[in-house]
């Protein structure tokens, strides 16, 4: 029964692992719900800033902010939002594949690339893959603050204002639902013109100190809020992916335990049958 003992030991080991993955699944569910609440709370802020920017631009049409001007592409920047931890399925891998594909298109057109990386997994990827990482930040925790991101985002905004990059995009996972997380590359600046629901009605405002100064400040705040929204949404996607990964691991452990239990029962049955045969054979010999 040496084989049966090994099987019993393996079953006990898998049951222990199953308890861990089940606990991690429950923790991920709780964290995902909190991340969804933060995501829902921050989204109206960015949308409202976008509406105000539209009003300000209309109020001062002779002033075109640098963030609204299209330039010939010589160098582009990416803010890459990844996770700090693993065990979240193919979340980061799919994100990096999407990014690498977009980078390849730019390189084919002779466009150089600068990177701002958020998250330990992104930093580790670009250490191996290569790339001009000009700013990096990690370990933002479960409740990231927009103030934690300002320094890294400012590096990219200054590069744009100085003419060192001609476009800035954010690369992150969109939280579609619990089962679906979609890697996306979204252009931040130059600001892409979109039909703005907030401009269905036009009002005349009095701006203090003036519309130009307000627009300058709001444009920077808008980009910061968009990056923050991407970080919060990526965190929700990470927790959803981890929940699914841990559920699959728990289910697979259950299947493996059932298979091993069957093998153990067969081995035990074979051993008992052999012992009975030996006893019967011995009795017949007597």
Swiss-Prot record:
It comes from the Bacteria. GO terms for biological process: proton motive force-driven plasma membrane ATP synthesis. The keyword Lipid metabolism does not apply. CDD domains: F1-ATPase_gamma. Keywords: ATP synthesis, Cell inner membrane, Cell membrane, CF(1), Hydrogen ion transport, Ion transport, Membrane, Transport. It is a peripheral membrane protein. F-type ATPases have 2 components, CF(1) - the catalytic core - and CF(0) - the membrane proton channel. CF(1) has five subunits: alpha(3), beta(3), gamma(1), delta(1), epsilon(1). CF(0) has three main subunits: a, b and c. Produces ATP from ADP in the presence of a proton gradient across the membrane. The gamma chain is believed to be important in regulating ATPase activity and the flow of protons through the CF(0) complex. Belongs to the ATPase gamma chain family. This is ATP synthase gamma chain. It comes from Pseudomonas syringae pv. tomato (strain ATCC BAA-871 / DC3000).
